[in-house]
Every structure is written in C-alpha cells, then in structure tokens.
C-alpha cells in the first residue's frame, strides 16, 4: 500500500510538471508571437518606427487583396474575405438585411455576385457569401482575442465607394478603448469604410468597421469575438438580436403589388392588376400573366395570402409564372406597403 501511494504521488508530480511545462511553452510562444513595439507607450527610436512600418507592409498586399467593396442597391460599403470559398465579414448596417443581392468588387475591379447571410442588429456584425466559384484571396482572422489596448493596428476600406485609380484607403493607428461589444481605434474612418477590416500587425482581422464616434479619430469596430459568438447563426442566415443597425422584417408587412383571380381556363392565378413600379412589375410580371407556383407550391389565392402573411418588407417570395410561351421563375423582393 505504501509503495502504491508513493507511486501515485510520483505520477502526480510528473503530471503537474508536464502541465507547467506545457503552459510555460504556451506563454513563451505567446510572448514570441507578440510584436515588441505593441508594449511601448510610444516608439522610442527610428528603429521602432521602421519595425512598425515593416510589419504593416509585410501584410498589406494580402490584406488589400481580400478587402472588397460591397454594392447593395444604391449604397456601398466594405468587407473582407475570410475563406477561399468567399465568406465575407462586414457590418449589419451595410447589408441591411438577410438574403440581399450584393455585388462584390475586388481590388482590381473584378465583380462577383453574392448574397447577404445573417446579421446581428445589436452589435452590427454581418456575413455574406460570394455565390460564384472560387477560390478567392482571403485573410485569417483573430480567433484568440489576443489584442490589447495600445496595440498598433491598420484599417482598410473603400471610402466613398470603389475607385480603381485611388485604390483602397489605408490608415494606421492604435487601439484606444474597449467595451463588451465594441473596440475603438484612432484610425480615421469616413463613409464607405463601414464593414471594412481592422488588422493587427500580424495581418489578422481583429475587427470590422462599424461607425465613427464624436470625431473621425474615434472609430468604432465590431470585435471578432462578436462574430465568433454567433458564427453558426450568421452562416445560417439568421437575424440575431434587436438593435439600431438593422430592422427585423415584420411578418405580413411585405407588399407584392399585384391583384389576381382564379384562372378559369388553366390551373393557376391570372394577374388582373399591377401597382406601377411595384415589386411584381419590377420583376417582369405583366397583367394577363398566369402565376403557376408560389414558393414551389401550386398557385392558389390561399397559398399566396398565407405566404405573404409570413413575410415582411425586404424579404423575398419565389414566384413562377408564364406569359405566352415563356415561363419564368424569380425571387421577388417585397417592399413596404404604399
């Protein structure tokens, strides 16, 4: 029994030593990964300034290649690609909703089509996906929340929209404040930068531009931890939270803008009236056309009414119709009632 007890204590001591050694290695690794100038209150020499400059420049090309301009309707913002398949992080107030069609403009002007995924209306976090085939240039994002106040950072964005001649705007600064759902830097941001990336000096995305404070030097960003907290929901196109950055669709508020009646000669609904410049007319539906399907089901007044009763302004309804010999199918975006 005495021998067994001693052997157990020896194993305990070895295990503790192994754990301490492992934690020590992690600590050393973390220290090794941390750039020394982040811990200086201010740069003390020309060498310090050169080190900051070289760190940013070594990561700038890749960062620029993954930073995109997002064109949604008549507005534009910025975003950053974080996967070769084309997953983009941006701000909720840029996408404005779930399922929005987006034109994604690369640094060289190449355009791809995409669709907005989920968003968090409380924190201003949002995702979208490029729907065309990749691979696309991308950058890594911070998964460990390793940045600290005072760390040097740089921001990228398409200020005022895409401008090939000007290129992407780059600003350098430091983290100056941190709150639960926001980090603040002194990188100057203006309109069009919203949704763009904030990088640490190792080239990882640590935040997404949200808004400007009392002055242009007080820039607010959504930290990556806020994306990670709801990552799966955002990827699944969920509308998360309630807040000022996006308006949640109210069921039954969506307006299609057409009147129909049961067709006597063929199965479906005959269009009898259209609201001028309404959603149905914009989609190409004409008076006299025959609605064949609503959301994949045979078109009836009951199905159309019940489906619209579940959808709000900004959401889409799948309509299949025929006009003469041509059959069309389209997601029609609903609007506010006039």
Locations of regions flagged by a protein language model:
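C-terminal cap/linker of serine protease catalytic domains
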Residues: 34-60, 102, 136, 159-162, ...
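A conserved glycine-rich beta-strand in the N-terminal activation segment of trypsin-fold
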Residues: 53-57, 66-85, 110-113, 138-140, ...
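Catalytic-histidine neighborhood of serine endopeptidases
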Residues: 76, 83-125, 130-135
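Catalytic nucleophile loop of clan PA
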Residues: 80-81, 188-209
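Conserved PDZ fold ligand-binding element
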Residues: 85-89, 206, 280-303
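Flexible, gly/ser-rich surface segments that form the specificity/activation loops bordering the active-site cleft
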Residues: 137-182, 190, 212-220
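PDZ/PDZ-like domain micro-motif
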Residues: 194-197, 264-265, 275-290
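PDZ-domain C-terminal substructure recognizer with occasional recognition of PDZ-binding tails
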Residues: 239-242, 286, 292-293, 305-338
């Amino acid at each position: 029994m005495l021998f067994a007890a001693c052997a157990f204590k020896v194993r305990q001591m070895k295990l503790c030593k192994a754990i301490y050694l492992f934690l020590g290695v992690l600590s050393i690794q973390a220290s090794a990964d941390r750039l020394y100038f982040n811990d200086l209150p201010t740069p003390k020499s020309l060498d310090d300034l050169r080190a900051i400059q070289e760190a940013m420049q070594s990561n700038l090309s890749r960062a620029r290649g993954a930073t995109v301009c997002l064109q949604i309707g008549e507005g534009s913002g910025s975003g950053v690609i974080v996967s070769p398949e084309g997953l983009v992080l941006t701000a909720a107030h840029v996408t404005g909703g779930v399922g929005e069609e987006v034109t994604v403009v690369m640094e060289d002007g190449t355009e791809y089509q995409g669709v907005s995924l989920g968003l968090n209306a409380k924190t201003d976090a949002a995702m979208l996906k490029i729907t065309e085939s990749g691979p696309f240039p991308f950058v890594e994002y911070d998964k460990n929340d390793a940045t600290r106040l005072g760390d040097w950072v740089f921001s990228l964005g398409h200020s005022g929209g895409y401008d090939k001649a000007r290129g992407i705007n780059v600003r350098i600064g430091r983290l100056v404040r941190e709150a639960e759902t926001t980090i603040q830097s002194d990188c100057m941001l203006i309109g069009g930068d919203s949704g763009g990336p904030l990088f640490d000096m190792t080239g990882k995305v640590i935040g997404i531009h949200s808004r400007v404070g009392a002055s242009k030097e007080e820039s607010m960003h959504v930290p990556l931890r806020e994306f990670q907290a709801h990552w799966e929901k955002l990827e699944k196109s969920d509308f998360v939270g309630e807040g000022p950055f996006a308006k949640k669709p109210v069921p039954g508020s969506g307006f299609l803008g057409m009147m129909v009646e049961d067709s006597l000669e063929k199965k479906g609904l005959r269009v009898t009236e259209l609201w001028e410049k309404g959603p149905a007319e914009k989609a190409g539906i004409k008076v006299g056309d025959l609605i064949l399907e609503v959301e994949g089901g045979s078109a009836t007044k009951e199905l159309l009414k019940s489906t619209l009763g579940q959808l709000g302004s900004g959401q889409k309804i799948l309509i299949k119709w025929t006009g003469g010999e041509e059959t069309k199918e389209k997601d029609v975006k609903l609007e506010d009632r006039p």
